[in-house]
Amino acid sequence: RNMTRAAAGGLTQHGAHAREILISLKAAANDQLDIPILGEEKIRTVCKAFNIPEEGRSLKEVANDLADVLLEDLSRALPGEYKTITALAPAERREVWKNLDILPISAYNEAFDAYHRTCVGTDGDWESNMKQFLRCGLAFTFTGVVAADIATDALFGQGGRRTSKVNIGALKKGYVNIAVHGHLPTLVSQICTIGASEEYLEKAKAIGAKGIQFYGICCSGLSSMYRYENVIPLCNAIGAELVLGTGALDCWVADVQDVYPAIMDVARCFNTKVITTSDAARLPGAEHIGYDHHHTNLAETKELARKILDRALEAHELRKGMPVFIPPYEITAEVGFSPESTVKHYGSFKPLAEALKDRK
């Protein structure tokens, strides 16, 4: 029962991540969010697998239908086909899952059912509980991971291979230093884009800084780095307090998952401004600037990003004279590998497969 509950918890974590990106994709397709849809190639490729018609239709119309299909798999209440599994899972695997009776109805349904059957006096059969555990696993994979990946590439474009200095020694002195921490890309995309504009470069210089530098903590760091040149990955969630302890960060922008409350205690020691952006993840003592519970202010994404950037500029001014120590530990990393970037680099997967077979 506890294992099933843990699986349901993991499903909701990644399912919530997928939900926000899918809401953003649908909003952008319906002109309710002023963000360009950059992943046309990804959208048109995936739509073929889902049998979504394209001929004579605009990119936004096709993107809207794709978002609807993925949202339906997230939240379907009536039993029906899990379309992402049908479209993207190998046929032999689907047959095995069907025979085992572990095909999910939807991400919402499997999390809901997992908590229902593991409550007092309900499912006492370990095999039945393990079936639900596996249903949660499939919903986690095909909505929490696959759908989230499709929607991210569809809205923000596919990241490319990049080479960068990483680790704690990559921190820079003299800049307005902003860390983005978490998993949700919509608001982060605008913070990074607007923060790199000439307008905000001039604002930073006006307060004596060399510019604005972004750093990635956890998954937001890597996701942002693939797409925006001015983001340096520093560490995973476990290293967050160590990074704050350098005294180099002016502002810490956190959304959801892997954001531990202890960062507030360390940030307070160095006057680092902490801003939360998700209604689902508040921190005591942090300022909250983000979407409301119903996402009624999604259209205000750029205004929210500007407000956060302005807070970072204010924090930089207030922190002048704060002792900073940056340990000299950094390495060069190459990141941003994907099937598409691999094919673009090698022409196909054949050279890579041959190298693996030849143990090269």
Where do the language-model regions lie?
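Metallocofactor- and cofactor-centric catalytic cores in central/energy metabolism, strongly enriched
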Residues: 1-360
